[in-house]
Amino acid sequence: MVEKLVSIIMPAYNCVDYISESIKSVQNQSYRNWELIVADDNSTDGTVDAVRSMAADDNRIHLLETDINLGPAAARNRAINAARGDYIAFLDSDDIWYPDKLSRQISFMEQMGYDFTYTAYEKINERGEHMGVVISAPKSVNYSSMLYQGDPIGNLTVVYNAEKLGKFYVPDIKKRNDFALWLKIMHDCDRAYGLDEVLASYRVRAGSISSTRKSK
């Protein structure tokens, strides 16, 4: 079976200490048909140079640059706008995917006919050490359960079917813009489905881009 293209959305800002490891976790995927779109938000450290170096050796990596810092929502939206994939996935520049993350999740979606999915994940510290904390993936959530019971979805685990649902852009709000995005998607697909396998590592550190999971 021909693998459909997955567009991976990665905003980046002053993350030179972590972004190479994050990108390598994408390059190590057993699922090979992907494009990684790194939207830099006017970094002032060596982030851009690190991405340029890796992109020079792998034409699946694309760097979007800007001379204005506009925040993570705008960065994600620039990457989403450039995405060509049948599926859209999200990974922040300090987080890590397990090697079979995409293959397991895309297979899950195609076998079950699901258009919006997420997985379980673990927490690691700034040094990449396991913290012994796993965030499980509920079987499914819908708009109402998200509003009244909270958001169990880790940004780094989400994949949605852009070929079927179209593209969704991140609301430009200061807090929980990922949560607002999931609600937008659920207006069209009603429900998101969880694959309760740990397939990613969320790095807990000061200054992390993602607004999800900091309180858990």
Role assignments for model-derived ranges:
Residues E3-V6, Q27-V38, G46, N59-H62:
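Short loop->beta transition adjacent to catalytic acidic/histidine clusters or analogous donor-positioning motifs
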